[in-house]
Amino acid sequence: MANEACPCPCDIGDKFEYGAKGQEIQIEHIKAYVSKPHSSTDKAVIVVQDIFGWQLPNTRFMADLLTAHGYITICPDFFVGQESWKPSNDWSTFTEWLQTRQATKVEKEMNVVLKYLKEQCHVKKIGVIGFCWGGVVTHHLMLKYPELKAGVSFYGIIRDVEDRYNLLNPTLFIFAEIDHVIPLEQVSLLEQKLKVHSKVDFQIKVFPKQTHGFVHRKKEDINPEDKPFIEEARKDMLEWLQKYIN
C-alpha cells in the first residue's frame, strides 16, 4: 500500500500473471508490444504504460482486451530503454526518477509509432489510452495530435500546462474516488474548464470507492466488491473508442 512518503500510489493493486498474446518488436529506436486481431482492420489503439513500464502484464492484458474487440494495439516503450519503476524502489527518489521520464515529452516516440501504424499496418483510424503516467501522456497527446480520433485517460491529468483544456478530439477521463494523487477538487476543476474551453466531446467519470489503478491493477476475483466498477470502466472505454473510431 502507499504511505505518506509515497508520492504516487501506483503500487496499490496486483500484478497479473498473464501470458500475452502479441509479440515484442523493434521500431526504429524503441521496442513495442504489438497485438493484432485475426481479421484485418484499419483501426488501432496505442496503449500507454504506467510507471511500471511497457512490459507489465496488466497493461498487455488491456492491450489484448482491445485486440479481442477488433483493434490492432501497440504498447511502446515510452521510457526508451530507461528502467521502469519498481515497487521496491525508494519512493523518496520518485520525483527525481520521474523528471527523466516526462509525460509531455513523448513526441519523438509517438511519431515513430504513428509512422509504423500507418505504413506497416495500413491503419487509418487511431485512438489512444493510457494509465497513470500514461493517462497524463494520453491527455497530452489529445492536445497535440489531431489524427488521434479518440482518447481514454485513466487516472492521469495534466496540471501545469496553460492550454491543457483545448482537446482536439473526444476524450474520456476515468478517475477513482479515493486517489491521493488526483484529489476530486482537481477533477472538478478539469471538468469546469473543459466545459468552457473544449470544442469537442469529452466525459469525466469518477468511480466510487475505487483507488488509483483500479481498472488495470485490480483483480476481479480477489476484489469481488470492485468487480462491477472494473467491468463498467472497461466497458466505458470500449464504447468510447467504438463511438469515435469508426
From Swiss-Prot:
Record's GO cellular component terms: cytosol
Coiled coil: none
Enzyme class, first EC level, given as a word: hydrolase
Keywords assigned by UniProt, alphabetized: Cytoplasm, Hydrolase
Subcellular location as annotated: Cytoplasm, Cytosol
A GO term for molecular function: hydrolase activity
E.C. no: 3.1.-.-
Entries under Gene3D superfamilies matching the protein: alpha/beta hydrolase (3.40.50.1820)
Catalytic residue list: 132, 179, 212
Signal peptide: none
Domain of life of the organism encoding this protein: Eukaryota
InterPro entries for the chain: AB_hydrolase_fold, CMBL, Dienelactn_hydro
Disulfide bond positions: none
Its biological purpose: Cysteine hydrolase.
Family: Belongs to the dienelactone hydrolase family.
Protein's name in the database: Carboxymethylenebutenolidase homolog
Organism whose genome encodes this protein: Xenopus laevis
